Amino acid sequence: MLFRSYIAWVGHATYLIKLGNTTIITDHIFSKNAGPLIFGPKRFTEPALKLNEIPKTDIFLLTHNHYDHQDMSTIRNFPFKDAKVLVPLKLGKYFKNYKDVNEMDWYEEIKINDHLKITFLPAVHWSKRSLTDTNKTLWGNFLIQYKNIKILFACDTGYGNIYKEIGEKYGPIDITMINIGAYDFRPMFYKSIYHTTPEEALNVAQDLRSKKVLGMHWGTFVLSLEPIMEPPVRFKENAEKFGFKKKDAITFKIGEINSLKSILKD
């Protein structure tokens, strides 16, 4: 890669985040379906690269156990099983043959090195993989602190007052990475309380006192009824209502790579 520190979108909630000499992958899913075996929503867009093409990865972050985030085929075939794995409580059992698996409770932090610390924080979400395991494993967000830069990886989440509390304790945040798609589930209900709309994502970032907000979790799988390309349009159009310049409400194209320096530029 060209940059010492960068963020690259592979698709959905899968990102490669390079911070100095450390490469992080998030919620990686490379399967064609977001479900068990061959079932579940099919991909609308292919991942930016194949699993065997990803660069050497040092840290693997998993936010929760839903099929579009915890993809067992990808976990089994992940080429870097010596990576440090950070997962919510009770999800470590899925990472057989991995050498360094760390289950985390909310507000628990792990120091990676002298320049990098990762804290697991609450999210407005839930967990489930079968008919009998609803909310039996934890879920959450990851706060990545690299030198003097704070990146909050918030996916999946709905809107809640918890973000004002997080903003007071950990803010201001430099970059909030948050879901902006999969919110329209009519006729069951008008919108998901567990997935922010583009406007709610901006509200979360506002509560966090975030400088930049990067919208994700759209354009990859058809998970709900809104037009698949609607989220980034609404996200950009409504930025100023929540105190952001349009240029600070950021979306990538799948496969796009941007240096941390360019993302943070005023």
Where in the sequence are the language-model features?
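Metal-dependent catalytic neighborhoods of phosphoester/phosphodiester hydrolases
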Residues: 71-80, 223-233, 261-262
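Active-site metal-binding loops of divalent metal-dependent hydrolases
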Residues: 28-30, 65, 123-124, 155-157, ...
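Pre-active-site segment of Zn-dependent metallo-hydrolases
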Residues: 1-4, 10, 14-62, 72-77, ...
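Catalytic core of the metallo-beta-lactamase
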Residues: 14-20, 112-174, 192-200
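Divalent metal-coordination and catalytic microenvironments
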Residues: 17, 27, 64, 71, ...
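Glycine/Thr-rich phosphate-binding loops of Rossmann-like dinucleotide-binding domains
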Residues: 34, 70, 95, 128, ...
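Metallo-beta-lactamase
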Residues: 4, 84-149, 234-256, 260-264
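Cap/insert and terminal regions of metallo-dependent hydrolase folds
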Residues: 54, 59, 84-86, 90-93, ...
